[in-house]
Design a protein with these regions (language model features):
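DHp/HisKA dimerization-phosphoacceptor four-helix bundle of two-component histidine kinases
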Residues: 55, 86-96, 127-134
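Conserved catalytic-core motifs characterized by acidic clusters
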Residues: 4-6, 28-45, 69-84, 111, ...
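Alpha-helix capping/hinge segments and adjacent helical runs
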Residues: 123-195
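Alpha-helical membrane and juxtamembrane elements of multi-pass inner-membrane transport
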Residues: 38-39, 85-92, 119-122, 126, ...
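C-terminal helix-coil-helix/basic helical segment that borders enzyme active sites and/or dimer interfaces
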Residues: 68-80, 95-131, 144-152
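FAD-binding core of flavoproteins
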Residues: 1-66, 79, 175-180, 184-195
Length: 195
C-alpha cells in the first residue's frame, strides 16, 4: 500500500492507493480464468449499484422525516413553515421522489431475485443508482433550505447528508456513466424491455 488518503466524510470507506511491481499470481490462485476479471467486476457493479440506490433511499427517508418534523414546528409569519406553499412543495416533492425511487429499487431487486436477464438487470441497476443518487441529492438540498441557517451548520443532519450524499453520484460509476450504460442498453434491447 502506497498510502491511504484521509476523507472528511463519516462513511467508513477508505480507498488506499496500492502499487504492484513484478507480481506473479500462481494459476491455482486465480479467481476464474485469466482475462475474465471484468466479468466479475460487472457482476459486482450490478449489485453495488443497487446498494447505492438503497443507501440513498435510507438517507432521503431520514431527511424527509427530519425536515417535515422541523417544518411542522418552525414558525414564520405566525404559521408553521410547512403551511407556506413553497416549503410545502419541497416537502411534497421530496416524498414523491422518495416513493418513486423506492418502487424502482424494490422492483429491480425483485426482478434480480426472480432471475431476470443479467444485461437487463445491469441497466436497471444503473437506472436505480442514477435516479436514487440524484434524487437523494435533491432531497438533501431541499432539507438544507427547509432548515434555513441551521441546515448549513455542521451538527445538522441536513448539512451532513448534503455533503456526504454527493459521493453517491460518483462512486460505482458516475451519473454520466450510468446514462451511457442505460442508453447503450436502450439502443440494443429497446426501451420497453428495460422499463
Amino acid at each position: 500500500m502506497v498510502r491511504t488518503p484521509a476523507y472528511s466524510h463519516t462513511i467508513s470507506h477508505h480507498h488506499p492507493i496500492v502499487a504492484f511491481e513484478d507480481v506473479r499470481v500462481p494459476a491455482a490462485n486465480l479467481v476464474g480464468a485469466e482475462g475474465d476479471g471484468m466479468a466479475f467486476a460487472y457482476e459486482w457493479f450490478r449489485f453495488e449499484r443497487l446498494m447505492v440506490a438503497a443507501r440513498c433511499l435510507g438517507a432521503a427517508d431520514r431527511l424527509t422525516a427530519e425536515m417535515t418534523a422541523f417544518a411542522a414546528v418552525r414558525q414564520a409569519g405566525g404559521l408553521p413553515i410547512s403551511q407556506h406553499g413553497l416549503v410545502a412543495g419541497m416537502l411534497a416533492d421530496s416524498l414523491t421522489e422518495l416513493f418513486a425511487a423506492r418502487a424502482m429499487t424494490y422492483e429491480t431487486a425483485r426482478a434480480i431475485d426472480q432471475g431476470a436477464d443479467v444485461k437487463v438487470s445491469h441497466a436497471q441497476c444503473s437506472m436505480a443508482k442514477l435516479y436514487c443518487s440524484e434524487m437523494a441529492g435533491r432531497v438533501a438540498d431541499r432539507a438544507v433550505q427547509v432548515f434555513g441557517g441551521r441546515g448549513y451548520m455542521r451538527e445538522n443532519v441536513a448539512e451532513r447528508f448534503f455533503r456526504e450524499l454527493r459521493v453517491e453520484r460518483i462512486w460505482e460509476g458516475t451519473s454520466e456513466i450510468q446514462r451511457m450504460i442505460i442508453a447503450r442498453q436502450m439502443t440494443k434491447r429497446g426501451p420497453a424491455l428495460l422499463a
